[in-house]
Amino acid sequence: MENNKCREDFRFTQEYEEDYPNTNERYYENYQVADRYYNYPNKYKEPKIKQCCCKKSMREALELLRYDALRPFVNFNQFAFISDFFIVGANLVGIDLSAPPKDNLSGLDGTFERFSACNCDLIDIAGRVSYPIPVPLTLEGLINTIGTIPGVAELIALIDAVIPPTIDLGAILDAILAAIIDFILAASTPLANVDLASLCNLKAVAFDITPADYEDFIASLGYYLDKKHYKECNCNCDCDDCCCNKGILDNLYMSNINNQVTVVAGSLVLTGVEVLGKKNDVIVLGNSNDSRIYFVCVDSIDYIA
């Protein structure tokens, strides 16, 4: 009440003095502006920006692997953990698009050990950190890459024409390229070994299943995932929402699209993988060729086909 009285007295004084030349109208206007914010703070709060976080969903998805029905099928020493700028437990490689489903990960050698005690933000892992830079892991892959360089084919033909037939040029080139591959792999040596991963920054997790157990694992996993409900197209969307997970889930999971999809999530590329289900904001994908499962944070997905 005292504040209200002060405002009334102030305004009365201003009205009384408005005919005098010394009246400070700007001061009065500034007072009114300040009055809105300081005396009525609840009416002029800045809108809160919703932050998209996959931590809870990724934790719930990983917790499924603790169940007795799923744990025996999982190789906990063949994991990869993908964030925006680094990968633990794998390198990036090229994809053979002729034989989907495929991914752009090498063999997995990271370890998922356990959930950190008394900490909801971290999981205990073991593995090496690498930059998400594709490396050729086969001689054929490197040869194909070098063969696309202009002038290389002509140079090889010229060398082949001048060397004696007793010299096996192919064997020499293979040895040179093999040495180059070894150098590239050595250059991609991990930056460091790590023991913990932040669930707040994980974009995707990949892990291997024993090939003979893949179908059994898929069947058991489906029991624990969210039930699928088809939805009709609804054009009344909340386009102001800064999170995209709802629209992506509607497209990947809630619609009658083909179950085989291609997904790009940061540095992870998956072609022709199967949509197995979801756990809240984590989409679960399967790769039957490599007996590999992917937990992908929906908000990290950039492109879909």
Swiss-Prot record:
<comment type="function">
    <text>Contributes to maintain proper thickness of the spore coat. May contribute to the formation of polar appendages. May play an important role in assembly of the outer layers of the spore coat.</text>
</comment>
<keyword id="KW-0749">Sporulation</keyword>
<dbReference type="InterPro" id="IPR048150">
    <property type="entry name" value="Spore_exo_CotA-like"/>
</dbReference>
<dbReference type="GO" id="GO:0030435">
    <property type="term" value="P:sporulation resulting in formation of a cellular spore"/>
</dbReference>
<protein>
    <recommendedName>
        <fullName>Spore coat protein CotA</fullName>
    </recommendedName>
</protein>
